[in-house]
Amino acid sequence: MKQYDYLIVGAGLYGAVFAHEAKKVGKKCLVIDKRSHIAGNIYTEPVEGINVHRYGAHIFHTNNKTVWQYVNQFAEFNRYTNSPVANYHGEIYNLPFNMNTFNKMWGVVTPAEAKARIEQQKAEAGITDPQNLEEQAISLVGTDIYEKLIKGYTGKQWGRPCTELPAFIIKRLPVRFTYDNNYFNALYQGIPNGGYTAMVENMLEGTEVRLNVDYLADREALNALADKVVYTGPVDAYFGYRLGALQYRSVRFETEVLDTDNYQGNAVVNYTDAETPYTRIIEHKHFEFGTQPKTVISREYSAEWNKGDEPYYPVNDAKNGALYAEYKQLADAEPGVIFGGRLGEYKYYDMDKVIEAALDVVQKELA
């Protein structure tokens, strides 16, 4: 008989939910992670008394009451509402695109005026069959919004001009004709008081966790410890990249402590011009309404991904989609292994959807 029922590779949200649920019904789990900390990309660490989101801003939002009640077992959430702003050459615009944005851009006051301005610009552009992201965006919101708030930012995000990006990346652009700056129209929203790491710690309470353990480097010995494996690492790496590497975008952060109590007045400021090299600046204290004497900011740079870099966003184009479909066939046929999470399923996953997926899988598994 093996020592554990489940070896869970990855101490992020998916792995932690699975471990918590399995432990509840008496299963013995070992959670391992190759990093030196738990919580995966939602890891927060205290700096100057401020919970810093080491891998970028994570704002919990969901319409799923079950998921909301689930996370509230492990943390108390504050009332933070995501209302980012865009800085275009020193002009500040509210996001998502709404009446505050249009008023600042054109001086319009009513929804009818804003709609008329957008329709006029769309008509002037005359695009009926968008061939790239630039044409797609202009056909949806007109030239002014595109030039000031989409073009530079999106180009930086993807590392190539919008004219070279496929139209399907932007299926729709949320345009609101109300004076509402709430980015996520979710029923439940907030940040866990004390940060995400403490929340994941509570999920993993009573479960054995080993850090700085590279599963792929010691697979046989680790597999021998448990009856089944839950793998939340990169699916292509699991199979030794035998079909080729899936592509990601990576992100690089420059984080610094500043001797001021308030640097930018908002948690998230996007820099939407092409000239500023970073895509946004995060001021972490505003996520928890901090009043500390100092502040911590992170400049976020989008970067090409190379093997060995931290993978952030899957490149969801046709080529990578087809390659993942082949890997999924291999994964489905792999005996005794459950693949899950952002990297295990090669998908962009909001936190609530990760929890939903993990609960769904673990309930079927333990039924």
Where are these regions (language model features)?
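Glycine-rich FAD pyrophosphate-binding loop
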Residues: 20-48
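Short, solvent-exposed loop/turn segments at secondary-structure junctions
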Residues: 13-14, 36-38, 100, 155, ...
